[in-house]
């Protein structure tokens, strides 16, 4: 599969480069589309899956039986695209439109360094982890701008909540990734996956020695994306839709798309940093060469990565259907008084485990 893609992509890349500056621009646009189109399609089916899963949990007839629950999500898309974008008369017109774009752009840009396989990555940057930290922290600026430009007290309150929440949990996520960097010895995402390779399968993954950091990163990822039970930014019972309260139509859809794209991105990153990425959990247990179509079961590949991502993406929905919303002060207390001290302690523990050879870097 990878060889087939490379045989197609490399000649195509050379052909575009032969066209001069215009070809370079077209190639850049093509790479942007290679990120945007799959993400948009994935979000569409993710919304369908969310409706189905919550429908099963809550025994809702619409998502379960009416048209097999497929048409509701697509009806929402058409409804949002064809609705008028209404702007409050007291809002800042330009900033009101720029805000959703500023939220969506980092959500798409972060995907450029995410590896799907050993060779299937758009940009195998040596500083991929630092780039991800930068991109994932930029989205909050769009939320703050939306709250300010709307000139609404509810929108502004939601934006301020989001700023405090993202800053709080960004620190915990960053400290959790410091442990990953120490254990892998790299900030390249592909090298982080290779550091978890070995003959013991999932026992070589960072999930076991870095389990507290895994929990911190997972929960912080849920808080970072403002999802239940950390959705005080859009608390319907308190501030309606938060920073999006004045948005409608396509502008609201951009916020919606950015949120779900970030949810899927966090699911990918958890799988890459702690669960071996595309590596098989039984890698090294079986060495027999049966057939190319069966070998991926123990040699690894993008299907394994997608299965791990599917689990964490479904967990987002499970949290939404099961847990009540935390109070704002509880969210802040969890981030500052529990997660940050825990990550600092476990960074030291990780350094000791690497020093004494408890954590062995992969092949």
From Swiss-Prot:
Q: Which residues cross the membrane?
A: 29-49, 62-82, 96-116, 127-147, 163-183, 202-222, 239-257, 264-286, 299-319, 339-359
A GO molecular function annotation here is: oxidoreductase activity, acting on NAD(P)H, quinone or similar compound as acceptor
What Enzyme Commission number(s) appear in the record? 7.1.1.-
Catalysed transformations (reactions): a quinone + NADH + 5 H(+)(in) = a quinol + NAD(+) + 4 H(+)(out)
What protein name applies here? Answer: NADH-quinone oxidoreductase subunit H
Cellular localisation: Cell inner membrane
Give a short account of what the protein does: NDH-1 shuttles electrons from NADH, via FMN and iron-sulfur (Fe-S) centers, to quinones in the respiratory chain. The immediate electron acceptor for the enzyme in this species is believed to be ubiquinone. Couples the redox reaction to proton translocation (for every two electrons transferred, four hydrogen ions are translocated across the cytoplasmic membrane), and thus conserves the redox energy in a proton gradient. This subunit may bind ubiquinone.
Protein's membrane topology: Multi-pass membrane protein
**Covalent S-S links between cysteines:** none
GO CC terms, sorted? plasma membrane
Entry's Gene Ontology BP terms: aerobic respiration
UniProt xrefs under InterPro entries: NADH_UbQ_OxRdtase_su1/FPO, NADH_UbQ_OxRdtase_su1_CS
- Report the main location listed first in the record: membrane
Q: Which gene encodes it?
A: nuoH
Which family does this protein fall into?
Answer: Belongs to the complex I subunit 1 family.
Classification via NCBIfam families: PRK06076.1-2, PRK06076.1-3
Q: Which Pfam families match?
A: NADHdh
Keyword check for Membrane:
yes
Q: Partners and quaternary state?
A: NDH-1 is composed of 14 different subunits. Subunits NuoA, H, J, K, L, M, N constitute the membrane sector of the complex.
Q: Which UniProt keywords apply?
A: Cell inner membrane, Cell membrane, Membrane, NAD, Quinone, Translocase, Transmembrane, Transmembrane helix, Ubiquinone
């Amino acid at each position: 599969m990878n060889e087939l893609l490379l045989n197609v992509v490399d000649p195509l890349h050379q052909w575009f480069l032969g066209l001069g500056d215009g070809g370079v621009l077209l190639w850049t646009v093509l790479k942007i589309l290679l990120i945007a189109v799959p993400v948009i399609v994935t979000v569409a089916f993710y919304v369908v899956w969310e409706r189905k899963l919550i429908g099963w949990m809550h025994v809702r007839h619409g998502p379960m039986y009416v048209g097999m629950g497929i048409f509701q999500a697509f009806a929402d898309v058409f409804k949002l695209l064809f609705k008028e974008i209404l702007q409050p008369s007291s809002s800042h017109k330009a900033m009101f439109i720029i805000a959703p774009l500023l939220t969506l752009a980092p959500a798409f840009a972060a995907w450029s360094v995410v590896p799907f396989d050993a060779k299937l990555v758009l940009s195998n940057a040596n500083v991929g982890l630092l780039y991800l930290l930068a991109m994932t922290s930029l989205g909050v600026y769009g939320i703050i701008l939306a709250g300010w430009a709307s000139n609404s007290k509810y929108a502004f309150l939601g934006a301020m909540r989001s700023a405090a929440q993202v800053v709080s949990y960004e620190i915990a996520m960053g400290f959790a990734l410091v442990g990953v960097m120490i254990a892998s010895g790299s900030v390249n995402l592909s090298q982080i996956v290779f550091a978890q390779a070995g003959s013991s399968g999932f026992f070589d993954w960072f999930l076991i020695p870095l389990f507290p950091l895994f929990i911190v990163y997972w929960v912080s990822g849920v808080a970072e994306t403002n999802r239940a039970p950390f959705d005080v930014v859009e608390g319907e019972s308190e501030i309606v839709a938060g920073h999006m309260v004045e948005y409608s139509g396509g502008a609201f859809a951009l916020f919606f798309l950015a949120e779900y794209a970030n949810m899927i991105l966090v699911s990918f990153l958890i799988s890459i940093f702690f669960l071996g990425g595309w590596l098989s959990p039984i890698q090294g247990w079986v060495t027999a060469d049966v057939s190319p179509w069966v070998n991926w079961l123990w040699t690894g590949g993008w299907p394994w990565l997608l299965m791990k991502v599917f689990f964490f993406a479904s967990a987002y929905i499970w949290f939404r259907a099961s847990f009540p919303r935390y109070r704002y002060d509880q969210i802040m207390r969890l981030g500052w008084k529990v997660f940050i001290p825990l990550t600092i302690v476990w960074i030291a523990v990780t350094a000791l485990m690497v020093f004494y050879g408890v954590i062995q870097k992969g092949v």
